């Protein structure tokens, strides 16, 4: 069962960014690579239980200042104690996994 939280508002996103360890998947419904990496993101949410996994559809939550920074999808941001510690763009499972491992 997926532990991914699907954020639908700026307020929700702000709340989850304050968790101890967070990975945010910024994506869009129309994005093929986003759809391809989604099952991997779901699977990793069960493996890396110390992280809060958050999904943000940039077309639905599009007024948040962080979302306005996104230039390509999928983009993943990693936060520890409210501070961004890493990011990358692209549907790359190995990079996603290694970045999670580096921030445990």
Swiss-Prot record:
Annotated site residues (Contributes to redox potential value) in this chain: 32-33
Domain Thioredoxin: 2-104
GO MF terms held by the record: disulfide oxidoreductase activity; protein disulfide isomerase activity; protein-disulfide reductase activity
Keywords, ordered alphabetically: Disulfide bond, Electron transport, Redox-active center, Transport
Any single GO CC term annotated in Swiss-Prot or TrEMBL for this entry: extracellular matrix
Annotated active site: 31 (nucleophile), 34 (nucleophile)
Record Gene3D superfamilies: Glutaredoxin (3.40.30.10)
Disulphide bonds in the chain: 31-34
Site (Deprotonates C-terminal active site Cys): 25
Tagged with keyword Disulfide bond: yes
PANTHER family, per database record: THIOREDOXIN-LIKE PROTEIN 1
Function of the molecule: Participates in various redox reactions through the reversible oxidation of its active center dithiol to a disulfide and catalyzes dithiol-disulfide exchange reactions.
UniProt record similarity statement: Belongs to the thioredoxin family.
Name the UniProt record assigns to this protein: Thioredoxin-3
Organism: Dictyostelium discoideum
Gene name linked to the record: trxC
